[in-house]
Regions:
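Extended hydrophobic-aromatic, low-complexity segments
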Residues: 73-75, 85, 97, 152, ...
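A conserved active-site cap/scaffold subdomain adjacent to cofactor or substrate pockets
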Residues: 78-100
């Protein structure tokens, strides 16, 4: 017999159910968000061959592993995109709101080796109230890349600890 089990905090499910019931609707079934996300855009070929779908949330990163058109594993690591903003704020000594704006408007996870000699700085409009700092885009992207790499390593370790798949031969969608 096939068994699929996903654990969640009971209070979170109860809260969601109460909100939906208050709208005079009812819950027929629950589905793990990353699983639903994967099914919404993955091709059948990906599902057959094996794929990992990774969803960076604000406070956590969730992932789903699909093999042979079946959900094999879901998991969560306790770091998300908000941790990137916190890292930027701490390292650059700026407010968290400014760090979030910089991350969204100017941040990149890939560090372009071709522009290391050409130093570009963040635009002034990202800094409110005359709080401008001369910060290089390379510095910002290095901070972002470091945290994203750490999060992806945590996902990798969780998947490998269950000996689910040979990750090197599978596609990964972020």
């Amino acid at each position: 017999a096939d068994i699929h089990a996903v654990l969640a905090e009971h209070s979170a499910i109860d809260n969601l159910k109460n909100i939906i019931n208050s709208c005079e609707l009812s819950v027929e079934n629950y589905i793990f968000g990353t699983y639903a996300l994967g099914l919404s855009f993955l091709k059948q070929e990906d599902l057959n061959d094996g794929v990992i779908c990774i969803d960076f949330g604000k406070d956590k990163t969730s992932f789903a592993v699909f093999e042979n058109s079946t959900l094999s594993y879901v998991g969560v690591v306790p770091y998300g995109s908000n941790q990137v903003s916190k890292d930027l704020a701490k390292v650059l000594d700026i407010k968290i709101e400014v760090a979030e704006r910089i991350k969204v408007e100017s941040g990149e996870c890939v560090i372009n080796e071709n522009i290391k000699d050409k130093i570009e700085y963040l635009p002034v409009h990202l800094f409110p109230d005359d709080d401008f700092r001369k910060i290089s885009k390379t510095m910002v992207n290095t901070i972002i890349n470091s945290r994203i790499e750490e999060i992806l390593q945590l996902v990798y370790r969780k998947i490998k600890s269950y000996n689910l798949i040979d990750i090197k031969t599978k596609k990964i969608y972020l």
